[in-house]
Amino acid sequence: MGDFGAAERRILEFMSKGTEFVFNGKGYTVMLSGKPTCHKGEPKTDIYILAESCEDEVEIKISYKKENADFIENKMSAERAEQLFGEDWIDIIEQSTTAIQDKFYERMLIYKNGFRRTEKGSITLGWKFELLNKSGGDLSGKMLLTDEQVVDVYAGSNLSSDKKNASVCGQTIRDSGVANYILMDENVYSAQDVIDKMIPIREYVMMHPDIYFACKALNYRTFAEKWDGNRPLSVQVNWDAINNRLVPELVFDKPLIVKGDEVAERLIHYMRKLNIRTTEDIDEDNSGTDKIV
């Protein structure tokens, strides 16, 4: 079906006003359809359909995912985490990362040499946070969520009001941004195909109850004196100078609150204090960690 946006548009074309389909054994006619939008960010619903039969009206709010899509959320921020997990988002993320904290403590932090996909000269600032529908990489695990919380993640139940009450074809519609169906089949060729292949989100969660997280390193590249932006970090490396040695401390209790710039500036401050410019200047006399490769 081609790229993601084109696939969405094609589905909406199938669901144009006046289109007829059978749903739950009854014939319906589309009254309104469109892509819900809001001022900032995106609702969970990709395709909104209001249809009526001779007896009732139905709102079909579809979250469309490509079949091979691994990411549920790949640029997690504090704001987005609260919208996905609700008010307990800090505890939820901290519990998930501390459940695999041994893996974090095993990680190399200073790369005097290139290692796997980490370039020579890197020093780790912390780890970004991603949500996936399957396990991904070494620093990955299962989110500790109830079935109801997983439903909330897929449906968008905790989204801010502007994302929940999104605009469809110029009119604000209550809860239009909260999805109630998921569609993961790209091979749809008619309105009836869409209806037949979409799955109620609660039913989807019963079949796929697990959501996974993966943590990807954000590194300060000492030779280039750069890092990849002010990304929120689920686990931070709090660098310090103790007894004239560069010492790391892993911090798990401030997920996504502390960002890359703050950690990088702290690291650079203590590197300068110890007359360290690149990893070539780090040795057994000025290093307070054995996590060096």
Predicted feature descriptions by range:
Residues M1-K17, T37-K40, Y105:
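A short, highly charged nucleic-acid-interacting micro-segment common to nuclease
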Residues W227-V293:
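Charge-dense, extended regions
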Residues R10, D56-E57:
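Generic structural microfeature
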Residues K17-S53:
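A short acidic/basic microdomain associated with nuclease active sites
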Residues F4, I11-L12, Y48-I49, K61-K65:
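Generic hydrophobic/packing signal
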Residues G2, T19, F23, E57-P248, ...:
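Catalytic cores of nucleic-acid endonucleases
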